[in-house]
Amino acid sequence: MTRILGIDPGSRVTGYGIVDDGRPTRLVTEGTLRLPRQAGLAERLGRIFDGLAELIAEHRPQEVALEQVFVHRNADTALKLGHARGAALTACVQAGLPVAEYAPARIKQAIAGSGRADKTQVGYMVRALLRLRTSPAEDAADALAAALCHAHHRSAPLTAATTGARR
């Protein structure tokens, strides 16, 4: 059984979700790192790094699935998102974890059957696939979707090699 950490990076809210990939796939934990608006970017990035490093130390995932940056109309927003991803990647690399990156559309396709699925559809499918009583917060659901997408690609390596999964 492989423990997978999914991360949905954001400069204000970073979602995380950890699953054990088995039969059935099982939720370990999920949540969000909420970063104060009044904090500067450097402080928020430090909190992302520290929060994920603590989560990794506590739950000992073996692999990481990280959502790739999507093209954003606002360059400043895209740069901040890129910085948040960098803080998340650094926490994972410092822990010696292999990281697979997936495009948002690839994650949605794997979880909801459509690369254009909305957040409600993704949340519903995450809840159904993990047999949860309630839906996780949006950012945590997106992180769990990344982890589930990675679990799917792990079980179908040829598919992963041909659909854009990057390690």
Curated annotation (Swiss-Prot):
GO terms for molecular function: crossover junction DNA endonuclease activity; DNA binding; magnesium ion binding. It catalyses: Endonucleolytic cleavage at a junction such as a reciprocal single-stranded crossover between two homologous DNA duplexes (Holliday junction). The active site is at 8, 67, 139. Gene3D superfamilies: Ribonuclease H-like superfamily/Ribonuclease H. InterPro entries: RNaseH-like_sf (IPR012337), RNaseH_sf (IPR036397), X-over_junc_endoDNase_Mg_BS (IPR020563), X-over_junc_endoDNase_RuvC (IPR002176). Mg(2+) 2 binds at residue 67. SUPFAM superfamilies: Ribonuclease H-like. Binds 2 Mg(2+) ion per subunit. Its EC number is 3.1.21.10. GO terms for cellular component: cytoplasm; Holliday junction resolvase complex. PROSITE patterns: RUVC (PS01321). Its cofactor is Mg(2+). It is found in: Cytoplasm. Keywords: Cytoplasm, DNA damage, DNA recombination, DNA repair, DNA-binding, Endonuclease, Hydrolase, Magnesium, Metal-binding, Nuclease. The keyword Cell cycle does not apply. The keyword DNA-binding applies. Belongs to the RuvC family. PANTHER family: CROSSOVER JUNCTION ENDODEOXYRIBONUCLEASE RUVC. Homodimer which binds Holliday junction (HJ) DNA. The HJ becomes 2-fold symmetrical on binding to RuvC with unstacked arms; it has a different conformation from HJ DNA in complex with RuvA. In the full resolvosome a probable DNA-RuvA(4)-RuvB(12)-RuvC(2) complex forms which resolves the HJ. This is Crossover junction endodeoxyribonuclease RuvC.
